[in-house]
């Protein structure tokens, strides 16, 4: 399935196989978290989102929490579609995952390090996820 979310002139598409209506009801929150992460990173870096589109694909059984690619991010379904009553920790993990993978659009896709420096990129990004996600944790 595909669902689109639009804010101003920016459109984001989500692709997924989930059919549970209770889980699909979380898409609005996920879209808002992705959009907030994009805005925060644009403000933080002073660089507009650098690619023509942004999509995310929620995959059943995906082996990682998330993996960004230019213009699209793959996410594990269990990391994105939470239980009907998620704990604050589960919501925080999802929010930080979105912030982390979105940050890769600037730090990894727009500016790519050579392979020998990849360790540094993975160590730097955790410092951007907490401040990026602090502004859009549900209920705060």
Regions found by a protein language model. Name each.
Residues 59-62, 78, 108-112, 121-124:
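An acidic- and aromatic-residue-enriched active-site/binding cleft used to recognize and process polar
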Residues 42-46, 107-108, 130-138:
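Sec-exported extracytoplasmic/periplasmic mature domains
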Residues 27-31, 115-123:
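Active-site metal-coordination segments of metallo-dependent hydrolases
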Residues 1-99, 128:
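Hydrophobic helix-coil surface modules that form long, contiguous segments used
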Residues 48-56, 113-117, 140:
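Surface-exposed patches in mature extracellular/periplasmic domains of secreted proteins
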Residues 98, 102-107, 125, 129:
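Active-site His/Glu-centered metal-binding helix of metallohydrolases
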């Amino acid at each position: 399935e595909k669902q689109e979310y639009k804010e101003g002139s920016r459109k984001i598409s989500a692709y997924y196989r989930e059919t549970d209506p209770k889980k699909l009801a979380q898409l609005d929150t996920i879209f808002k978290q992705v959009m907030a992460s994009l805005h925060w990173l644009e403000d933080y870096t002073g660089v507009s989102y650098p690619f023509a589109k942004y999509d995310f694909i929620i995959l059943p059984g995906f082996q990682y929490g998330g993996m960004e690619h230019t213009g699209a991010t793959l996410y594990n379904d269990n990391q994105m579609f939470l239980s009907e009553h998620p704990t604050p920790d589960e919501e925080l993990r999802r929010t930080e995952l979105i912030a982390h993978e979105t940050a890769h659009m600037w730090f990894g896709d727009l500016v790519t390090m050579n392979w020998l420096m990849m360790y540094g990129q993975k160590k730097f990004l955790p410092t951007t996820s907490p401040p990026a996600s602090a502004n859009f944790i549900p209920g705060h």
